[in-house]
Amino acid sequence: MKITIFCLTILTLSITFGETNEDVKDGSLKEMDEMSLLQELMSVEAALVEKEMKAEAEENRDSREKRCWGLNVPCENENSPCCKPYVCEKTTGYGWWYKSPYCVRKGSG
């Protein structure tokens, strides 16, 4: 009888403390899972922020006004980037001397 009571007491204590140890293990596993999820979330957030910054830089680069050539600047052909009031034309004043068209006002050459 004493042995039975002793065995039941040990069994009860082992079950009680065994569950406590499992709770501690579960708690530490949950913390580790939370930390890994947090690190994963931070890496995803960093990637999204980097992507957004690249998109913003791309947008700023595309929205910048393109450079154009001013009055009396030599141009190569009609598709050269003369500024808006000017066009690339062969002129009688400069074209015959330098043998290239120039950016001039529309209708002046």
From Swiss-Prot:
Belongs to the neurotoxin 14 (magi-1) family. 07 (Jztx-56) subfamily. Expressed by the venom gland. The keyword Zinc does not apply. The presence of a 'disulfide through disulfide knot' structurally defines this protein as a knottin. Keywords: Cleavage on pair of basic residues, Disulfide bond, Ion channel impairing toxin, Secreted, Signal, Toxin. It holds the Pfam family Toxin_22. One of its GO terms (cellular component) is extracellular region. It is found in: Secreted. Residues 1-18 form the signal peptide. Probable ion channel inhibitor. Residues 19-67 form a propeptide. This is U6-hexatoxin-Hi1a. The lineage of its organism: Eukaryota, Metazoa, Ecdysozoa, Arthropoda, Chelicerata. One of its GO terms (molecular function) is toxin activity. Its main location: secreted. InterPro entries: Toxin_22. Disulfide bonds join C68-C83, C75-C88, C82-C103.
